[in-house]
């Protein structure tokens, strides 16, 4: 049975993670598998061992709230499989419930209790329906957030700060940290933030960065091919599109025909196939 293997940067992040944290990493760093590994180890599993270590039975139900695209393309299913987990009860090796759904449906899970939630592609901004549902879920369950882009403004952190109990609500946060410019009474603008040191400490408490240095070497090789020079010159002379059998009316149309003549060359296609062999 396959063991669970994490890379060094993923292990470092795993050791720093805690309930209510934000796992931050670029695309390709492995946030998904690291987040499931956190759930897996919290439920008794172990990573980087000689063989698969079973979680306690039954482990907590697992809910993954992600984008509709990731749900529909089953991206998370591939990561779950390493841990013998599946949204299909007949495939899942455990008796717990595993759900992968989109942010649009987060309201369906506000009554769930004593489960574990992974919120992927963090969409918690403002005070709309998603944020309200998130607050209800966070009170009764364990949870973590995944993002490639941490908040641009301190206001973006309000939902996570409130859910972690740092502030009672948005009003308290605003009263303690936000100074508005009221020149336009209908649309006040944030002028500055107060007590930023506290905000930095709170952010450092919950933000887990996945530091991953890519050690790759770029390889460039020029491959020279031929094309139909006579057809190329004829298109420029006659301003006639041989593919659509109609006149070329502008410069962009001529450039399109020239590119197509070059790219459709049999010599070019053969060279491309040889690269993939």
PLM feature spans:
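Inter-Walker segment of RecA-like/P-loop motor cores
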Residues: 67, 80-113
């Amino acid at each position: 049975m396959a063991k669970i293997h994490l890379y060094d940067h993923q292990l470092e992040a795993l050791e720093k993670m805690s309930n209510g944290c934000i796992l931050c990493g670029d695309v390709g760093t492995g946030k998904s598998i690291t987040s499931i590994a956190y759930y897996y180890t919290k439920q008794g599993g172990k990573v980087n061992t000689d063989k698969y270590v079973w979680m306690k039975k039954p482990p907590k139900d697992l809910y993954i709230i992600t984008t509709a695209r990731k749900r529909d393309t089953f991206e998370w299913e591939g990561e779950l499989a390493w841990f013998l987990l599946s949204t299909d009860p007949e495939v899942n090796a455990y008796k717990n419930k595993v759900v992968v759904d989109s942010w649009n449906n987060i309201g369906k899970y506000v009554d769930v209790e004593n489960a574990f939630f992974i919120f992927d592609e963090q969409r918690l901004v403002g005070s709309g329906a998603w944020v309200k549902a998130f607050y209800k879920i966070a009170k009764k369950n364990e949870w973590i957030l995944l993002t490639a882009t941490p908040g641009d403004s301190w206001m973006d952190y309000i939902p996570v700060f409130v859910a972690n109990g740092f502030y009672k609500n948005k009003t308290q946060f605003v009263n303690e940290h936000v100074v508005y410019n009221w020149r336009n009474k209908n649309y006040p603008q944030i002028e500055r933030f107060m007590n930023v040191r506290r905000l930095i400490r709170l952010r450092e408490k919950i933000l887990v960065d996945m530091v991953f240095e890519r050690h790759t070497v770029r390889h460039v090789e020029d491959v020279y091919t031929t094309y139909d020079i006579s057809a190329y010159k004829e298109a420029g002379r006659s301003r006639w599109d041989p593919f659509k059998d109609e006149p070329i009316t502008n410069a962009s149309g001529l450039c399109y025909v020239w590119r197509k003549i070059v790219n459709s060359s049999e010599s070019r296609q053969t060279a491309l196939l040889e690269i993939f062999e």
